[in-house]
Amino acid sequence: MQDNKDVFRRIERQYYRDRMGTLGLSTVEGMLLRWLGKQGQTRQEELVVQLVLDKGAVARALARLEELGLVERAVSDRCRREKLVSPTPEGLVLAGAIQQSVEEWNTVCFQGFSPQERALFTDLFTRITQNAMEYKQGEKEHG
């Protein structure tokens, strides 16, 4: 018997892989660009933490996004080891297309839900995500 979570995750991953592929991006590149489109200039390390991604994967994805002219990286004035990442105007346009894909996926997923059901789901899922992030942080701190 298949777990509904597993089925949902597979379908969602395929959806985003397909959508990002049509934009010429990997899913990680899409995640980063979407974040930068919403948040603006961000420390590279903050992207790792907020998106719960591997440092190496983030560095590789940002290097490719930089090659494509979608982001710019600069050394911070505060700390020479710290890199700041900003979306370019072209990156912001693509971030908008990525956000549209996210909204389309949400429309698919919440079809037939009342506003109250959607709000309840969002609240519960936010709490689940916070629990998972706290677990992950504890794992890092305690080995």
Task: Tell where the protein language model's regions lie, with residue ranges.
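Short, locally clustered residues in the helix-turn-helix/winged-helix DNA-binding domain
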Residues: R9, R34-K38, Q99, T126
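N-terminal leader segment of winged-helix/HTH proteins
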Residues: M1-L23, E139
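Charged, amphipathic alpha-helical coiled-coil/dimerization segments
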Residues: R13, A63-T126
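Residue-level detection of the helix-turn-helix DNA-binding "recognition helix"
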Residues: G21, G37, V52, A63, ...
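C-terminal regulatory/oligomerization modules of transcriptional regulators
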Residues: Q116-G143
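Residues within helix-turn-helix
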Residues: Q44-E45, G56, A63, K83
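Short capping segments at the starts of secondary-structure elements
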Residues: Q39-R43
